[in-house]
Regions:
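Short, surface-exposed loop or secondary-structure junction motifs
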Residues: 23, 77, 81-82, 135-339
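Acidic/histidine-rich, surface-exposed loop or edge segments in extracytoplasmic proteins
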Residues: 23-33
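Short, conserved catalytic-motif segment at the N-terminal edge
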Residues: 33-95, 118-120, 167-170, 174
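Active-site SXXK
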Residues: 46-52, 63, 69-71, 95-122, ...
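Short, glycine/proline-biased beta-turn/loop segments that scaffold the active-site neighborhood
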Residues: 120-135, 217-219
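Short, surface-exposed beta-strand/loop micro-motifs that present aromatic residues
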Residues: 340, 347-353
Length: 353
């Protein structure tokens, strides 16, 4: 499990409000009282994490909290897996991000292309992917799929029969719709796989190549990548699960390979899952977003672009473009402001900003 929160909401008015940095902040360490947060914050977070581990929610995890460019809490807890000899977790432990891939990688790439004028959210998916030509899908636009309103089903176990991008595109094209495009919000992995394929068609690069060049590399996120199954990273990666025959693949201990079976069947680089990262790297990414698309002199997107992509798109849904925003019973809890945005992942990952 990994949880990261970049806090922007006020927690109390009993102490003077700290002076914010004059320019876009670069992360530094601080104490809760430095940024007007409760003095017992760290002790409270320690207790929550330790209780969760003791109750078996996870063998370990990492939690980071920051405000005004100060990381006031970044700490690893427990171990990488349940084995007694397993390595302890720290801020550099790499986790399978699961559906955080949708926002950290795929949405970031799409946002860059839209800002550059290479991606038009109101064009149909078929105009970018002519193979996506089923009559019932002709009206599906890019805006619909990045807000999960394309009418596609949430998921299917295609990994039991199919492999690779081309086969997945063909099968998604053939799958029946769950609703009329544009009428309902259904969280769908297919939406972000299609977004990935559009990005790759526009750029002529694979998603991992493009997002590493345009986002992870410039930001210095050196531990954020797809397919990290090499000797260099293996000892830092927390195993995800033991895959049994029930999943149809029998991969054994899933360690250094993507947990999501459809992402694995596509090749490990997928728009909906497959990214690995650390709390340290995600703190940089989160601060870039809080800075309006810039970090340490590196501009990823313009503030107006970021504001547009992180705002709810419909009164009928909390969904922004790629991102989610707070709603009743959402994972944001009760204290993030209405302007916040975030996402979660199946493997226990979470980011709220």
């Amino acid at each position: 499990m990994i949880a990261i929160a970049a806090i922007a909401a006020c927690t109390t008015t009993s102490r003077p409000i700290p002076v914010r940095p004059s320019g876009p902040p670069v992360l530094s360490s601080g104490k809760p009282h430095d940024v007007n947060m409760r003095a017992d914050l760290n002790a409270t977070l320690d207790s929550i994490m330790k209780v969760g581990i003791a109750e078996g929610a996870a063998p370990g995890g990492v939690l980071a909290v920051g405000r005004y460019g100060r990381i006031v809490h970044m700490k690893g807890y427990g171990r990488q897996d349940t084995a007694a000899a397993s390595a302890p977790v720290d801020e550099n432990t790499m986790y399978d991000m699961a559906s955080l891939t949708k926002v950290i990688a795929t949405t970031s790439a799409a946002m860059i292309l839209e800002e550059q004028g290479q991606l038009d959210l109101d064009r149909t998916v078929a105009s970018y992917l002519p193979e996506f030509n089923a009559p019932d899908k002709a009206a599906i636009t890019m805006r619909m799929i990045v807000t999960h309103r394309g009418g596609l089903e949430a998921f299917a176990a295609l990994y039991k029969e199919f492999r690779g991008r081309d086969q997945y595109l063909a099968q998604i094209n053939l799958r029946p719709l769950k609703s009329t495009p544009g009428t309902e919000t259904v969280y769908s992995d297919w939406d972000l796989i299609l977004t990935q394929l559009v990005i790759e068609r526009i750029t002529g690069r694979t998603l991992d190549q493009f997002v590493t060049e345009k986002v992870f590399g410039p930001l210095g996120m050196t531990s954020t990548m797809f397919t990290p199954d090499s000797v260099q990273y293996f000892s830092r990666i927390a195993p995800t699960e033991v895959d049994t025959a029930t999943g149809g693949l029998m991969r054994g201990l899933v360690h250094g390979k993507v947990h999501d079976e459809n992402a694995w069947a596509i090749g490990g680089v997928a728009g909906h899952a497959g990214l690995f990262s650390t709390t340290h790297d995600l703190s940089i990414f989160a601060q870039m977003l809080l800075n309006g698309g810039e970090y340490n002199g590196v501009r990823i997107v313009k503030p107006a672009t970021l504001a547009r992509w992180t705002a709810p798109q419909s009164g009928a849904s909390s969904r922004a473009l790629g991102w989610d925003t707070p709603s009743k019973n959402s994972s944001a809890g009760n204290y993030f402001s209405a302007r916040s945005f975030g996402h979660t992942g199946f493997t226990g990952t979470s980011i709220w900003i």
